Amino acid sequence: MSTIEKALTLLEHFSSNRPEIGLTEFKTRTSIDKGTLHRHLTALKNSGFLEQNYLTKAYRLGPAVIRLAAVRENTVPIVKTVQYYVDRIANDIHELVHAALPQKNGMSAIYAKDGGNHKVRVNFDEAEILPFHATSSGLALLAFHDDTFVGKILSKKLVSFTDSTPTNAIDIQANLETIRACGFAFTDQSYEDEVGSVAVPFFGVKGDAIGTLAIAIPVSRINETFHETMITQLITASTELCRDLGGQIPTNVAKAWATKLEV
């Protein structure tokens, strides 16, 4: 990994639940020596990607991040496009729905809405990177990504988050084949205990998966009927979203989705 990559990777540690991080915490989280870490943080600060709380000296995201996020949305307005579909599903089924795009090490949520008022809810941090191997979003994306990318992800040491997290590359590859055949991914407590999720990919102009739509829900509220409802809601939304984005749904996926909607 290049010096620039190592420095930029530090930005991934920030989240809504972790808006500020001090030098010592960075060292604990990254295992990078303090000297190198300080140089990386100084470079990011000088470039505007980070700023320091003058009282605590902890680092937080800087104005350059906001500017680039605005440029991205103005030039590639995918957030505005997916927002309609996420809101629609969330309002219909009264559960947490989110859209995510792939990054190097996982899926990054770009928009989420919890349409329910249940006492038991899924705690979701939009700034958190969702691991490819442990989430329905990640698996739905991997199933329709190129073999080289998938190979790199599965060749790494796969972290176990719960007793149900899949960490065997062969088993995951087999699951990806199943996902390719049906067009959606389902996970049961593989990333967080008592939480299940369903996800479908959405596709770009070349028929490649460029992101996912997903529903996360406490497993106590999942039954066969509602499971089917979630899948049909996601398939319908992704089909329309692909149309809006000018995307091409692969023929086998379109057939699988059409069959599912007929049931």
Question: What feature does the model see in each segment?
Answer:
Residues T56-K156:
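Amphipathic alpha-helical effector-binding/dimerization core
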Residues T81-I89, L154-A199, D244:
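Short, basic/aromatic recognition patches
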Residues F202-V205:
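Sensor-regulatory modules in signal-transduction proteins
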Residues A112, V120-D125, F184, K255-V263:
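C-terminal regulatory/oligomerization modules of transcriptional regulators
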Residues M1-T75, V79-K80, D87, T239-D244, ...:
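N-terminal helix-turn-helix
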Residues A169, D193-E194, G211-V263:
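Juxtadomain coupling helices with adjacent low-complexity linkers
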